[in-house]
Curated annotation (Swiss-Prot):
Biological pathway: Cofactor biosynthesis; 7,8-dihydroneopterin triphosphate biosynthesis; 7,8-dihydroneopterin triphosphate from GTP: step 1/1
Class in the EC hierarchy, top level: hydrolase
UniProt keyword GTP-binding present: yes
Name assigned to this protein: GTP cyclohydrolase 1
Keyword annotations of the record: GTP-binding, Hydrolase, Metal-binding, Nucleotide-binding, One-carbon metabolism, Zinc
Pfam family name, one: GTP_cyclohydroI
Organism the protein comes from: Geobacillus kaustophilus (strain HTA426)
Family (UniProt): Belongs to the GTP cyclohydrolase I family.
Lineage, uppermost ranks: Bacteria, Bacillati, Bacillota, Bacilli, Bacillales
NCBIfam families in the record: folE, PRK09347.1-2, PRK09347.1-3
SUPFAM superfamilies: Tetrahydrobiopterin biosynthesis enzymes-like
Amino acid sequence: MPEINFAQIEYAVRLILEAIGEDPNREGLVDTPKRVAKMYAEVFAGLQEDPKQHFQTVFSEEHEELVLVKDIPFYSMCEHHLVPFFGAAHVAYIPREGKVTGLSKLARAVEAVARRPQLQERITATIADSIVEALEPHGVMVVVEAEHMCMTMRGVKKPGSKTVTTAVRGVFETDANARAEVLSLIKA
């Protein structure tokens, strides 16, 4: 993946400022192109990461029951409008043959996937698929809830509305009780 081109971003931001009728040389804006480039490097850092890398450390435990990390806060940037959306991810999996990962690794994978121009549906599926590929669990269920600024500050202008997406893999695809257990624990 190519590195962030700071100079190109700075140039583009100057063009945007000029295109909306602003003076990029006025006091409050003179450093804005540099700040935006630095911010993009941070908020799009996930482009440089493979979420599966966070699951390289695994532990062998005699545990094949549900593991759920809920309310993992995240932010991302809508790839359609380049405005933020943010919310919480809930990640559940059922280990196979005692193959578990550190709980923080689930949160790190969420962050790696979210920190790129993205769609919420893709975040949800990519997290689930990364866990399946890396840990080979009996099942994975990911639920993502988010508020999208593209619906809050433009277009329909509906602040507070949330989008919920799910991805189910393995036993969660066929076992309604397993899905219901995860959903009830998320609400608890």
